[in-house]
Amino acid sequence: MKLKITILSLVISFLPSISFADAYIENKHGKITWRDCKLFYVYDDYKKDEIIPTIRYIETISNFTFRKWKKSMKKQPHIEIYYLGSSDSNVLGRTTLMDSHNKARINNVYVSMFTKDQDVLLHELLHGIGLAHSDDPNSLMYPYDSENQVLTEQDLINIRNIPCGSKV
C-alpha cells in the first residue's frame, strides 16, 4: 500500500506568508476529505483538560464529532496527537495527513506538538480535518504565529464547509 504524506507546519517568523489560493488542503486528486464526519482521536503526553476543550470547540464550529479511539479500532481512520516537548527549530506543531492509494481520502492524521499552546493545537487540529493556511495575518490559520490571531469569519465559513461523510 502506497501512502502519500502531506506535512503542514506552524512556524514562528515574521517573514511574509506564501499566499494560498484555496481554503482546503488538496492533493492531485482534489480536496482532502474524511469518509465520515465522526472522527476518532487518541493523544499522548497531554492531560485531558489540555486537549478535550479544543476538540469540543471544533465540534461546535464544524460538521465533525469526535470520539476517543480504542486500540481495537486499528482500521478506523483517526487523529493521533503527540506532545514531543520543545524543539530546537521554530516549528511549534506539525500535521501529517495520510491517504492511501493516492486518493483524496484521509486515512490517519498525526499531529506532532512542540508546545502545549491551545492556539497552536487548534491550528494543527484544523489542518487535521482539512483546513489549509490562510493568507490573512489576523487569522489563527496564518502559517506564522503572532499575537492576537483569531479564527476569522472566513475561517469559520471554511470550517463549516469542509466536506465529510455523505457531503463529499
Labelled PLM ranges:
Residues 2-20:
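Classical Sec-dependent N-terminal signal peptides that target proteins to the secretory pathway
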Residues 19-168:
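Zinc-dependent metalloendopeptidases
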